[in-house]
Design a protein with these regions (language model features):
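N-terminal Rossmann NAD(P)H-binding glycine-rich loop of SDR-like oxidoreductase domains
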Residues: 14, 18-22
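Rossmann-fold cofactor-recognition segment
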Residues: 42-56
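Conserved NAD(P)H cofactor-binding loop of Rossmann-fold oxidoreductase domains
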Residues: 76-81
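Substrate-binding pocket helix/loop in short-chain dehydrogenase/reductase
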Residues: 84-85, 89-94
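Active-site helix of classical SDR
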Residues: 108, 144
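Residue(s) in the substrate-gating loop at a strand-loop-helix junction
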Residues: 128
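C-terminal helical subdomain
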Residues: 168, 188-225
C-alpha cells in the first residue's frame, strides 16, 4: 500500500521503535495517529491517550479509532517477561496477554467495519521470532506472540476478497529498553544477534508498502522458524545450552 496520504494508527507510537516509525511514515507522506499511554512529543500528529493494559482504555481507544477510520493499523506496543513461569505474578501474566494479544484483537475489531465499507485497509501485527520459536523463560511472551501470529493468519483468511491486507512481522531481538539487564546478559552470553530499531522500522514500512503477508527478520532465525515447524525436537537440542544459561542467570546468587 502506498503510504502517501494514508492515516496510520500506531500503538506504542511514543516508544523506541514506535517513535521512529511515526517519523518514518510521516516522511513518506502519511498522517500518523499516535496511540500511547505516554505523552506524545510531537503535537502536530493526532494523539490518542490510553493504557493498553486497561480494558476500559482499550474500549475507548477502539471507539476513537472507529471515528478516525485509519487506512492502516499497526499493532506495535508490547511488553516482555524473562523469568520462570512459576515466579511470574498472575497480575503480570494477565497484563502481558492483555497488551500483547487482547488489545491488538480488540483494536483490529474496531477498525474493520470502516475498512470493509471502504474496500481497503491494512492490519499490521508486530510479533516476534519467539512466536514461532518459543523460548524457555519467555513462556508467556512467546505464547502471546504465537497467538498474535495465529490471529494474523486466521484473520487474513477471513478477510479474503475484502480488499483488506493482514501483515505479520516477526523481528528477532531488537536493541530497545524492553530488554532489561538480565535479558541483555543473556544476549551477551549466548551471542544473540540484536538488530537496531532503525532496521526494524525500515522493514515494517517496506512490508506495508509491498502488502507483505509474513515477514521474519534475521538470519539464521528465519530458517529456524521453518525447522521448528517441521522438526521441533531438533530445535530443542539446539536451544538446550541457551536454556541452561538463562536458568543460571535467573538463579539468585548467594
Amino acid at each position: 500500500m502506498n503510504l502517501k496520504g494514508k492515516k496510520i494508527a500506531i500503538t506504542g507510537g511514543t516508544g523506541c521503535i514506535g517513535g521512529l516509525l511515526v517519523e518514518f511514515v510521516a516522511q513518506k507522506g502519511a498522517t500518523p495517529v499516535i496511540i500511547s499511554r505516554s505523552p506524545a512529543p510531537n503535537s502536530k500528529w493526532q494523539y490518542i491517550h490510553g493504557d493498553l493494559s486497561n480494558i476500559d482504555d482499550v474500549t475507548a481507544i477502539g471507539k476513537q479509532l472507529a471515528k478516525i477510520q485509519p487506512d492502516i493499523l499497526v499493532n506495535l506496543a508490547g511488553i516482555q517477561y524473562f523469568g520462570s513461569l512459576d515466579e511470574q505474578p498472575s497480575s503480570q501474566i494477565e497484563m502481558l496477554y492483555q497488551i500483547n494479544l487482547i488489545a491488538p484483537v480488540l483494536l483490529t475489531q474496531a477498525v474493520l467495519p470502516s475498512m470493509k465499507k471502504r474496500g481497503s485497509g491494512q492490519i499490521v501485527n508486530i510479533g516476534s521470532i519467539f512466536g514461532s520459536i518459543p523460548f524457555a523463560h519467555f513462556v508467556t511472551y512467546s505464547s502471546a506472540k504465537a497467538g498474535l501470529k495465529a490471529f494474523s493468519e486466521a484473520l487474513r483468511r477471513e478477510l479474503t476478497d475484502t480488499g483488506i491486507n493482514v501483515t505479520y512481522i516477526a523481528p528477532r531481538a531488537v536493541k530497545t529498553p524492553i530488554n532489561n539487564e538480565k535479558v541483555m546478559q543473556l544476549a551477551k552470553q549466548t551471542k544473540m544477534a540484536m538488530d537496531d530499531p532503525e532496521r526494524i522500522v525500515a522493514r515494517i514500512a517496506n512490508a506495508i508498502e509491498n502488502d507483505a503477508k509474513d515477514v521474519y527478520i534475521g538470519f539464521p532465525e528465519s530458517i529456524f522458524v521453518r525447522v521448528n515447524a517441521l522438526l521441533p525436537r531438533v530445535v530443542d537440542g539446539a536451544l538446550a545450552k541457551n536454556d541452561r544459561i538463562a536458568a543460571k542467570i535467573l538463579t539468585p546468587q548467594s
